[in-house]
Amino acid sequence: MLARHHDPIVAIATAPGRGAVGIVRVSGKDIAPVIAAICGRALAPRQATYLPFRDAQGQVIDQGLAIHFPAPHSYTGEDVLELQAHGGPVVLQLLLARCLEAGAALNPAIGQPWLAQLRVAQPGEFTERAFLNDKIDLAQAEAIADLIDASTETAARSAARSMSGEFSLAVNTLLEQLIHLRMLVEATLDFPEEDIDFLQKADAQGQLSRLQATLTGVMQRATQGAILREGIKVVIAGQPNAGKSSLLNALAGAELAIVTPIAGTTRDKVSELIQIEGVPLHVVDTAGLREALDEVEKIGVERAWAEIESADAVLFLHDLSRRDAALPAQDTINYIAADDRIARTLANKLPENTAIIDVWNKSDLTSPAGLQQVQGGVLISAKTGAGLQTLRQRLLQVVGWQAAPEGVFMARERHVRALHHVQDQLATAGRQLQAARPALDLLAEDLRQAQRQLSEITGEFTPDDLLGEIFSRFCIGK
């Protein structure tokens, strides 16, 4: 994609389907012939002009608004034409074809097409050109896609902050501090004969400590932003008839899963996207965990464990009424033993960073003696809603959600990984500075690697294959 960014491009910029308004966007160098062919005349810069859009025979395709954004004052940094027409698919396809036709028309002065290379844009190519022409950096470009894909209001507002440059400003502030510190180290390396200890005199250790403190704040906001973007996968697990489907319905506020008194009703997963304080959670209800009674249930249990093993958090649901002292002793013993087996399997199968929350359900059906058995976890009734707010807050706590007071900006996992690498490099640099005889060449290399990681976030230094992957995930027309 990068090799062809000089070609003029065109695409439908609005979502597929019918709508009140649809937009066709053209970007490139010297697109005046396309403007003249479709609009019949030149357009005043950055002014919306209502006029007919015509085909090659002069027939009206539609009437709408045309806006010309001359370079460099446009979204892509190139000459841009936007045709805002009625949002019917046929109309927009006719306008798209007309743009391509106008570009291929012969220029009588030279006997060749006006815009021989005018073509349909690749996914994300308009935004890619904005990045290549320094209209936005890479973090802002990613934020545009994240804003489009946002599943909650909080996520959308965070993406808007990143799109406006808040995240980039934070990264560039880190870069400025880091570069200044690196210059001190490089100066000490370049002028070893000078009778001046650059590092001590310039308080290099203090500068590094302040840089690390700033980095910690940025990492906190970026980590929260990654949670908003990626969402959290929460799996409800437990024995049959523990109330897993009822809990999913209660959290979602809708009857999504079938609820019956018959154990083993849920045979396959049921999932729903919900939000808690703007944090998107992908909640999955699974088949009850027990020795399967038939082949279908066996498959359901296997799928349940597959979902559990890929979860960020597991709600281990216990039927507290089954532990009630009023039940026959052997039934209670058997139920507790089965819960204990599941608990051991969860501990063995899941990574240490997977949160497991014990959820004690059916408090409304449990005697006071049974309620006294609860130790730890969250006590709820999926039927009455008791304890659900406590469970929601506990979920946010265990997944690490803690909104920064100055607001969260949207970030991606690659950004968080890069910041962690920077943190590690600065920690190594700190140990070098504290040594009796610092290895300045190693210290300089640590700082150089940290600078490179930060530069990858904004795209100042980014491999072409990563750029291709990022922009290919955009929709065509953006």
UniProtKB/Swiss-Prot annotation:
Residues reported to bind GTP: 241-246, 260-266, 285-288
Keyword hit for RNA-binding: no
Protein's name according to its UniProt entry: tRNA modification GTPase MnmE
Compartment(s) of residence: Cytoplasm
Species this protein is from: Polaromonas sp. (strain JS666 / ATCC BAA-500)
Cofactor names: K(+)
A Pfam family matched in the record: MMR_HSR1
Quaternary structure, from the entry: Homodimer. Heterotetramer of two MnmE and two MnmG subunits.
Ligand binding ((6S)-5-formyl-5,6,7,8-tetrahydrofolate): R25, E82, K135, K478
GO MF term set: GTP binding; GTPase activity; metal ion binding
Binding positions for Mg(2+) per the UniProt entry: S245, T266
GO biological process: tRNA methylation; tRNA wobble uridine modification
Enzyme class: hydrolase
Gene3D superfamilies associated with the record: P-loop containing nucleotide triphosphate hydrolases, Probable tRNA modification gtpase trme, domain 1, tRNA modification GTPase MnmE domain 2
List of residues binding K(+): N241, T260, I262, T265
Keywords per UniProt: Cytoplasm, GTP-binding, Hydrolase, Magnesium, Metal-binding, Nucleotide-binding, Potassium, tRNA processing
Protein family per UniProt: Belongs to the TRAFAC class TrmE-Era-EngA-EngB-Septin-like GTPase superfamily. TrmE GTPase family.
NCBIfam families: mnmE_trmE_thdF (TIGR00450), PRK05291.1-3 (NF003661), small_GTP (TIGR00231)
Top-level division of the source organism's lineage: Bacteria
Cofactor annotation remark: Binds 1 potassium ion per subunit.
Keyword NAD: no
An annotated GO cellular component: cytosol
Domain TrmE-type G span(s) in chain numbering: 231-400
Protein's job: Exhibits a very high intrinsic GTPase hydrolysis rate. Involved in the addition of a carboxymethylaminomethyl (cmnm) group at the wobble position (U34) of certain tRNAs, forming tRNA-cmnm(5)s(2)U34.
